[in-house]
């Protein structure tokens, strides 16, 4: 080996024998000083010429051994790197395992809190529904009692009159009988005409039962689909949305009420020309607003929006329940439909003046086939089944509910805002192009 290290001297035969350590199996008296690259074995010098390895590529065995040593060292290096990779993989998998366990526990804790919140909301809803029934029952019973008391008073009057008439009929003195009859005649004539029959109007709680029946059916309809399928649909839907930040969130559904129930609170609010932008035009009945080419001339009202194509209704609601509809078929690529306080800023195009971008307003927005719910700058993505043509807006002022429905889509629920309203609410619109109308409701 020392001779091989010099690199310039050809190894001697004895060194080759010592290096190889064994003789040729075919020519046993000769040293196996060569290495057959094809057969991968050591041979003597005669084998490539006369033996079984005739014509095979060969080289010095010691040189092949040095090359093999280098290959072995390279293999050891690669094995060490690969072993470290597997060790790193195990570490990452163990870290991911711990994170997954922690995430699973935190998710279950979150779910427990949400279901507790849901139960509390259901309990509160049940209490409110029962309170509604009790309140209306007491009001109706009070009316019934007043009607019954009135009937009893009439009975007492008629009983008294009956006694007096009987006494008159039994009076033996003709003069006294005539005088008594004459004094009572007018009252007798008044009481002899038959009174009206009283038929108490029964109080029905079917609308309440129908509403909560629809709620239960909507929940049951959703839960009939296996949970894994619902979650998969939700994940796929949200992953297709680049703006989504919470893939896997469950979809909120709300029951769709019958339109006939909402029409009990129907309103047809008219629009206020003093609030609309100068580029907007109002129809004669003040129910349709459209974009114009030029601004209107004349004095500028102080209530007018001077930068945004917005308009408020003349009518406002500060108590009770109200329902109106908005037709957006001709509104083009973009529109905003909602409600706002009169304190909404009218000057400039800042967030304080934009519908839905402040605490004074709530709205649904459509632009470029995307739908959003906006309030105070916070937005929620909406995914209606079809493009919206007409919206229904329901306001329950005391309950703090402002809900939106797809009228042409079977009154499917779009979004509900919940708030404690502090000022009267005005229906509000904003246009991008085209026209928006408020239909007359029956």
Curated annotation (Swiss-Prot):
Ranges annotated as B box-type zinc finger: 19-61
* PANTHER family in alphabetical order: B-BOX DOMAIN CONTAINING, TRIPARTITE MOTIF CONTAINING 14
PTM statement from Swiss-Prot or TrEMBL: Ubiquitinated. Undergoes 'Lys-63'-linked polyubiquitination; this modification allows IKBKG/NEMO recruitment to MAVS. Undergoes 'Lys-48'-linked polyubiquitination by RNF125; this modification mediates its degradation via the ubiquitin-proteasome pathway.
Q: Which residues bind Zn(2+)?
A: 24, 27, 47, 53
Mention one GO biological process in which this protein takes part, according to its record: negative regulation of viral transcription
Name of this protein: Tripartite motif-containing protein 14
Its quaternary organisation is: Interacts with MAVS. Interacts with WRNIP1 and PPP6C; these interactions positively regulate the RIGI signaling pathway. Interacts with CGAS; this interaction stabilizes CGAS and promotes type I interferon production. Interacts with USP14; this interaction mediates the cleavage of 'Lys-48'-linked ubiquitination of CGAS. Interacts with TBK1. Interacts with SPI1. Interacts with KDM4D and USP14. (Microbial infection) Interacts with hepatitis B virus HBX; this interaction inhibits formation of the HBX-DDB1 complex, thus inhibiting viral replication.
Family affiliation:
Belongs to the TRIM/RBCC family.
Q: What is the lineage of its organism?
A: Eukaryota, Metazoa, Chordata, Craniata, Vertebrata
Q: Which PROSITE patterns match?
A: B302_SPRY, ZF_BBOX
Its biological function?
Plays an essential role in the innate immune defense against viruses and bacteria. Promotes the 'Lys-48'-linked ubiquitination and subsequent degradation of hepatitis C virus NS5A leading to the inhibition of viral replication. Also plays a role in the inhibition of ebolavirus infection by enhancing IFN-beta and NF-kappa-B activation after binding to the viral protein NP.
Q: Which residues form the B30.2/SPRY domain?
A: 249-442
Q: What is the predominant subcellular site recorded for this chain?
A: mitochondrion
Q: Write down the superkingdom of origin.
A: Eukaryota
UniProt keyword annotations, A-Z: Coiled coil, Cytoplasmic vesicle, Immunity, Innate immunity, Membrane, Metal-binding, Mitochondrion, Mitochondrion outer membrane, Nucleus, Ubl conjugation, Zinc, Zinc-finger
What does the record say about induction? By interferons alpha and gamma in a STAT1-dependent way.
């Amino acid at each position: 080996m020392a001779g091989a290290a010099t690199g310039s001297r050809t190894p001697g035969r004895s060194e080759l024998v010592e290096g190889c350590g064994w003789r040729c199996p075919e020519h046993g008296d000769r040293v196996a000083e060569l290495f057959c690259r094809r057969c991968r074995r050591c041979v003597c010098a005669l084998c490539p010429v006369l033996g079984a390895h005739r014509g095979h590529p060969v080289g010095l065995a010691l040189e092949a051994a040095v090359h093999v040593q280098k290959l072995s060292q390279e293999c050891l290096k690669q094995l060490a790197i690969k072993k470290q990779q597997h060790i790193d993989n195990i570490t990452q998998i163990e870290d991911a395992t711990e994170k997954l366990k922690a995430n699973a526990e935190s998710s279950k804790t979150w779910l427990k809190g949400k279901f507790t919140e849901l139960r509390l909301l259901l309990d509160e809803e049940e209490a409110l529904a029962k309170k509604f029934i009790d309140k209306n029952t007491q009001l109706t019973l009070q009316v019934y009692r007043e009607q019954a008391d009135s009937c009893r008073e009439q009975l007492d009057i008629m009983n008294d009159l009956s006694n007096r008439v009987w006494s008159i009929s039994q009076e033996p003195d003709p003069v006294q009988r005539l005088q008594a009859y004459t004094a009572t005649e007018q009252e007798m004539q008044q009481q002899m005409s038959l009174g009206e029959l009283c038929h108490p109007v029964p109080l029905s709680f079917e609308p309440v039962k129908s509403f909560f029946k629809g709620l239960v059916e909507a929940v049951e309809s959703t839960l009939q689909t296996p949970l894994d399928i619902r979650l998969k649909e939700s994940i796929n839907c949200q992953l297709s949305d680049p703006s989504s930040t919470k893939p896997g969130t469950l979809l909120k559904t709300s029951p769709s009420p019958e339109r006939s129930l909402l029409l009990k609170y129907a309103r047809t609010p008219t629009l206020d020309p003093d609030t609309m932008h100068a580029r907007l035009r109002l129809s004669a009945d003040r129910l349709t607003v459209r974009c114009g080419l030029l601004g209107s001339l004349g004095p500028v009202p102080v209530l007018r929006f001077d930068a945004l194509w917005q308009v408020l209704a003349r009518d406002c609601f500060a108590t009770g329940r109200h329902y109106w509809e908005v037709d957006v078929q001709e509104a083009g690529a973009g529109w905003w439909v909602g409600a706002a306080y009169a304190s909404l800023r009218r000057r400039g195009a800042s967030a304080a003046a934009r519908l839905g971008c402040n605490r004074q307003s709530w709205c649904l927005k459509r632009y470029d086939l995307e739908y959003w719910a906006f309030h105070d700058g916070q937005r929620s993505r909406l995914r209606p089944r079809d493009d919206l043509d007409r919206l229904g807006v329901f306001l329950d002022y005391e309950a703090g509910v402002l809900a939106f429905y797809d009228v042409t889509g079977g009154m499917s629920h779009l979004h509900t805002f919940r708030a404690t309203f502090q000022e009267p609410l005005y229906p509000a619109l904003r246009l991008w192009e085209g026209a928006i109308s408020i239909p007359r409701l029956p």
